[in-house]
Amino acid sequence: MSNIHPTALVADGASLHPTVTVGPYAVIGPQAVIGPGCSVGAHCVIEGRTTLGADNRIFPFACLGAAPQDKKYAGEPTQLVIGQRNTIREFCTFNRGTVQDRGLTSIGDDNWIMAYVHIAHDCVVGNQTILANNATLAGHVQVADLAIIGGLTGVHQFVKIGAHAMAGFASRIAQDVPPFMMVDGNPLAVRGLNLEGLRRRGFPAARMAGIKQMYRLLYRQGLTLEAACQAMAELPAAHPQAAADVALMRAFLAACTRGIVR
């Protein structure tokens, strides 16, 4: 049997691995699936079609899988899917998806999600991200791997935040943030590259040189976005170690629908 506190309410039909622990007064709905090694804190609520992978730690009063805050929602059986080894701190709220998108809100693996973070319907959060206290993702936001979002930052609907990007405290993000960039403020502005983050992740100097050249093309040479993208196509010849990073950046820019922070 799972280690379930006697005051917790686990509905018939819920699927809990035998190694799951559930704290006092937690409420788990009939469609929840909770994988091995998960810890559900006191007073947590897990409802709807919510699936958690292995070894997630959910702190007290988090609410996962509630209906999307979308007036068009009419009770469709949408989902919230969370991967493995995530830390989800107190009072976080993650909503299920809507049928206007994929019907799915998804969160990957190894994310560090601090207190009071809100992840709205249809968001896609990658792996190894950090979302600091009170960060708020509106509907359909995409946050790529290893991005960092500062506390009290608000992210507009449909915005994409690229891999390795970093947003400072209390920023207002209404346009897409390209990979590797560091942004801050209200109004938001690019402050440079997230160099310290890249160094901590072991990026060698030769690879960093290619990323710096992409930054110059986007932000320091007065080029249009189209011209900067075309110029980037030539970078792998001079910076072969950054070829994958160039491909990542060009794919991100091609997929932008809200324009980028410039």
UniProtKB/Swiss-Prot annotation:
CC annotations in GO: cytoplasm; membrane
GO biological process, one term: lipid A biosynthetic process
Pathway given in the UniProt record: Glycolipid biosynthesis; lipid IV(A) biosynthesis; lipid IV(A) from (3R)-3-hydroxytetradecanoyl-[acyl-carrier-protein] and UDP-N-acetyl-alpha-D-glucosamine: step 1/6
One Pfam family recorded for the sequence: Hexapep
Reactions catalysed: a (3R)-hydroxyacyl-[ACP] + UDP-N-acetyl-alpha-D-glucosamine = a UDP-3-O-[(3R)-3-hydroxyacyl]-N-acetyl-alpha-D-glucosamine + holo-[ACP]
Subcellular localization: Cytoplasm
Major localisation: cytoplasm
SUPFAM superfamilies: Trimeric LpxA-like enzymes
One Gene Ontology MF term: acyl-[acyl-carrier-protein]-UDP-N-acetylglucosamine O-acyltransferase activity
UniProt entry keywords in alphabetical sequence: Acyltransferase, Cytoplasm, Lipid A biosynthesis, Lipid biosynthesis, Lipid metabolism, Repeat, Transferase
Top-tier EC class: transferase
EC number: 2.3.1.129
Superkingdom to which the source organism belongs: Bacteria
Gene3D superfamilies found in the cross-reference section: Hexapeptide repeat proteins, Udp N-acetylglucosamine O-acyltransferase, C-terminal domain
Subunit structure: Homotrimer.
Family designation: Belongs to the transferase hexapeptide repeat family. LpxA subfamily.
Functional description taken from the UniProt entry: Involved in the biosynthesis of lipid A, a phosphorylated glycolipid that anchors the lipopolysaccharide to the outer membrane of the cell.
Stated name of the protein: Acyl-[acyl-carrier-protein]--UDP-N-acetylglucosamine O-acyltransferase
Lineage: Bacteria, Pseudomonadati, Pseudomonadota, Betaproteobacteria, Burkholderiales
